[in-house]
Amino acid sequence: MLSLPSAWLAELNDQHALITDPDGRAGVLAELAISAHRRGDVDAGQLADMLEFAEAARLWALIEDVYAA
């Protein structure tokens, strides 16, 4: 089962922030993921998943913005 840091998941689930600044929020998510890996909180596989989720969230937010306009 995939277990990711709860603080990181909270950031990932902040839809308003993602839609407001997709690129910036994805960057923050990536930095938080890398920091968690450096601290040893997540392994390499979890880091890869977190980075993929950050990119998926960015793309989702961009699509949401297009459909909201």
Predicted feature locations:
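Acidic, Ser/Pro/Thr-rich low-complexity regulatory regions
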Residues: M1-A69
